[in-house]
Amino acid sequence: MITILTGPAAAGKNTIGHEYATRCCSQCSVIDGDAVRWMLRQPHRAPWDGEESLFQHRLGVKHACLLAKSFVSEGYEVVILDVVWADLAQVYRRELAEFSMKIVRIMPSWEASLDRLHNRPYTITDAQARWVYDTQKELKDFDLDIDNTARSVAEVSTWLDTINHKNP
């Protein structure tokens, strides 16, 4: 099983992904799409930096999928953390077509997302966060959607456990 968690900045993808992997799975790998893309050092482009950024993001998706395939072949469940936009869901679906896979959009309100962003170390501007939020709001290619504005990390992790292990 491969679960791709997408959502805006500060939606809780990392926290939820790690909680789910630790609490709900016997063997699980967490692949952070940001960490994969940061392997590209010169030049490194953020998603809002134009056409080159989409090329780099597609390359990051392909490498995240290579890692996912390797972990699945060793018997691990996989959680991929990424911001899926443009045609990236199609790239994930094509690259992982032979596996059971779900794209789950975690979508808090803009206000909750911004509040969470301001209560953690600085990473991106409010304008950049808004760009990411709007791309996630417009995203149509996902399998499941959850509004975690008022849900705890444990609640969302339990929900993921139910859809992946109890009602696959």
For every predicted segment, state its role:
Residues F55-E98:
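Glycine-rich phosphate-binding loop used to anchor ATP phosphates in small-molecule kinases
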Residues H18-H63:
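Conserved substrate/cofactor phosphate-moiety recognition/catalytic segment
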Residues P8:
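P-loop (Walker A) phosphate-binding loop of NTP-binding proteins
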Residues L5:
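Hydrophobic anchor at the beta1->P-loop junction of P-loop NTPases
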Residues D82, A97-L117, I146:
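Conserved phosphate-donor/acceptor-positioning beta-strand/loop module used by diverse small-molecule
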Residues N14:
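Walker A/P-loop
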Residues A11:
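ATP-binding Walker
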Residues N119-W159, K166-P168:
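Small-molecule kinase domains that catalyze NTP-dependent phosphoryl transfer to phosphate-bearing small molecules
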